[in-house]
Amino acid sequence: MGNEFRVCDDCQATNIKTLIPKLKKIDSCASIEIGCQSYCGPGRKKSFAFVNNRPVAAPNEDELIKKIEAKLNK
């Protein structure tokens, strides 16, 4: 089963225009769902994505990508 990324297009700390290409670079075969993830509180202050149904958050997008890569390489 492939990886799944879910990101919000409405949260203030998440820029999907830059995040989506980075997620595709990590796993080009992963499914990517864009829409509200009901994670609004943390989404105001931190960049986040759900990776295989688990939330991953970081203060900025670069740190988020590092955390996602680490999570998938376990």
Curated annotation (Swiss-Prot):
Sequence similarity: Belongs to the UPF0741 family.
Recorded superkingdom: Bacteria
Pfam family, one: DUF1450
Protein's organism: Bacillus cytotoxicus (strain DSM 22905 / CIP 110041 / 391-98 / NVH 391-98)
Protein name, entry field: UPF0741 protein Bcer98_3905
